[in-house]
C-alpha cells in the first residue's frame, strides 16, 4: 500500500510532462513581441506580481501567530500550500476558466489557454494592452492564490489538511474562476452590467468573506473557551508583509506605471495608516 502511495507523485509528474508535450505553451515558430508592449509597465507589473505573492506568506504569519501553539505549523501550512495547489490548477485550466472565451458571460472556455497554450506570444489582454499576456495571467494567479488562503482564518484549528486541499480546489474552480470571469472579462455577465471591481473587492474579498462565513457556521465554534495567541511577533510580521504586498495588489491593478497606479498606492498608504492608528485608539480605550 505504501509503495502505491509513493508512486502517485511520479504518476502525476509523468502526466504533466506528457500533457506539456502534447500541448506545448511555446509556439513552434518564434515571433516578435506583440505591438504595444511597454517596458516600464512590464517592469512595474513584474514587481507588483512579486509583491502580491508576498502577501500569502504574510497571511500565514498573521494567522499562525493568532492560533494556539500546537496548531501554528498546520495553520501556516494552509496558506503556503495554496501557492502550490492553486498555481498548478491555474496553469492547467484555471486561467482559461477565468479569462478564456466566454460562455454566456458566466465561465470561460477551459480549452482557450489550456496548459498556458500560446501564452508567450499571445495577444495582450484587452484591459491590459501594454503588458504581455503571460504576465497578466501570472499576476492574476497571485490573486487566485491568496483568496482561498484568506478563508483559513474562519476555520483555523477545525479542519483536516486533506479536506482543506479539496476545499481550495473546489473553491478555485467553482467559485473564484466563474466570479472572476463574470466580473473581469469584457464579455462577463457582471462586467456588462457595469460592475467595477478595481482590485478584487468583489472577486477576492466578497467571495472569501462569504465562504468564510459559511465555513464558520458549518464547522461551529472552537471547543476551547480561553484562547491566547501563540506568537504576537508573527502577527506583527504578517501585518507588515501584508501591508507591503498590498501596494502591488492595489497599485498593480492599474496594469501599468501610470497616474492611476500612483493614486492607488497613495490611497493604500493613507488608508492603512489611518486604519492602524484608529485600531490602536479603540484598543487603548
Where are the regions a protein language model picked out?
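Hydrophobic alpha-helical transmembrane bundles of multi-pass membrane proteins
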Residues: 1-285
Amino acid at each position: 500500500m505504501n509503495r502505491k502511495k509513493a508512486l502517485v507523485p511520479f504518476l502525476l509528474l509523468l502526466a504533466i510532462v506528457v500533457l506539456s508535450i502534447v500541448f506545448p505553451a511555446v509556439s513552434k515558430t518564434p515571433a516578435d513581441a506583440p505591438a504595444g508592449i511597454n517596458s516600464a509597465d512590464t517592469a512595474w507589473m513584474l514587481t507588483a506580481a512579486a509583491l502580491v505573492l508576498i502577501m500569502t506568506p504574510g497571511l500565514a504569519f498573521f494567522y499562525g501567530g493568532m492560533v494556539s501553539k500546537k496548531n501554528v505549523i498546520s495553520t501556516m501550512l494552509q496558506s503556503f500550500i495554496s501557492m502550490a495547489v492553486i498555481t498548478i490548477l491555474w496553469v492547467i485550466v484555471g486561467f482559461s476558466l477565468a479569462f478564456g472565451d466566454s460562455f454566456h458571460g458566466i465561465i470561460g472556455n477551459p480549452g482557450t489557454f489550456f496548459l498556458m497554450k500560446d501564452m508567450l506570444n499571445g495577444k495582450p489582454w484587452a484591459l491590459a494592452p501594454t503588458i504581455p499576456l503571460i504576465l497578466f495571467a501570472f499576476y492574476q494567479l497571485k490573486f487566485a492564490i491568496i483568496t482561498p488562503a484568506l478563508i483559513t482564518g474562519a476555520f483555523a484549528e477545525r479542519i483536516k489538511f486533506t479536506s482543506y486541499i479539496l476545499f481550495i480546489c473546489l473553491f478555485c474552480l467553482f467559485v473564484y474562476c466563474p466570479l472572476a470571469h463574470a466580473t473581469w472579462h469584457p464579455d462577463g455577465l457582471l462586467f456588462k452590467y457595469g460592475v467595477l471591481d478595481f482590485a478584487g473587492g468583489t472577486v477576492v474579498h466578497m467571495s472569501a468573506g462569504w465562504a468564510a462565513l459559511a465555513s464558520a457556521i458549518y464547522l461551529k465554534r472552537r471547543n476551547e473557551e480561553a484562547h491566547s495567541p501563540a506568537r504576537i511577533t508573527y502577527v506583527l510580521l504578517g501585518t507588515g508583509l501584508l501591508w507591503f504586498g498590498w501596494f502591488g495588489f492595489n497599485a498593480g491593478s492599474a496594469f501599468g506605471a501610470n497616474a492611476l497606479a500612483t493614486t492607488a498606492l497613495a490611497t493604500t498608504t493613507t488608508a492603512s495608516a489611518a486604519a492602524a492608528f484608529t485600531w490602536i485608539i479603540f484598543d487603548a480605550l
